[in-house]
């Protein structure tokens, strides 16, 4: 009997260790489209209006207010296992805007940081990026996971960067 319990405990530990890590609570992602067609989203953003989606991006502009933070991002692809970060783009991609109705620490808002967001799509909005006003796909974040890479590093560069050994700081933010 003890041997069976020991085998069961070992198998449970092994299976748990092999499980795919998740970024967000299942209550946040249960109704989510994990990798929506971004080309359609850009061509006709209102097609996804009212949908819950998971998007990935690189921060290019941040505008804070008392209500929260508006992030304008370069779209990146979501990989098979989102917890490992977005897929880096070798060429410039389209942009989108996401509003996080809460507080994100200053290091989480650095230009170049990569993020994954679980969000509700809204109507496209006019956003100001470096003085140019453009209509962009617009979402309101439920939860957001940020890899604090800054603009000079990719997620894959950590923990061994040219500056030495630094573990990659990352954090998940969920609105209450």
Question: PLM ranges: what are they?
Answer:
Residues 18-176:
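OB-fold and OB-like single-stranded nucleic-acid-recognition modules
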Residues 1-18:
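Sec-dependent bacterial lipoprotein signal peptides
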């Amino acid at each position: 009997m003890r041997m069976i319990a020991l085998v069961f405990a070992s198998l449970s530990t092994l299976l748990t260790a092999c499980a795919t890590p998740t970024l967000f609570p299942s209550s946040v992602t249960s109704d989510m489209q994990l990798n929506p067609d971004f080309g359609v989203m850009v061509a006709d953003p209102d097609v996804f209006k009212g949908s819950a989606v998971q998007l990935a991006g690189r921060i290019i502009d941040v505008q804070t207010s008392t209500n929260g933070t508006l992030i304008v991002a370069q779209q990146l692809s979501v990989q098979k296992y989102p917890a490992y970060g977005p897929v880096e783009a070798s060429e410039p991609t389209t942009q989108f805007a996401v509003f996080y109705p809460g507080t994100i620490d200053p290091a989480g808002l650095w230009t170049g940081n990569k993020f994954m967001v679980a969000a509700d799509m809204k109507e496209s909005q006019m956003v100001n990026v470096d003085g140019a006003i453009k209509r962009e796909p617009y979402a309101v974040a439920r939860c957001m996971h940020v890899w604090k890479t800054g603009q000079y590093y990719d997620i894959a560069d950590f923990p061994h960067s040219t500056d030495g050994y630094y573990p990659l700081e990352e954090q998940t933010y969920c609105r209450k």
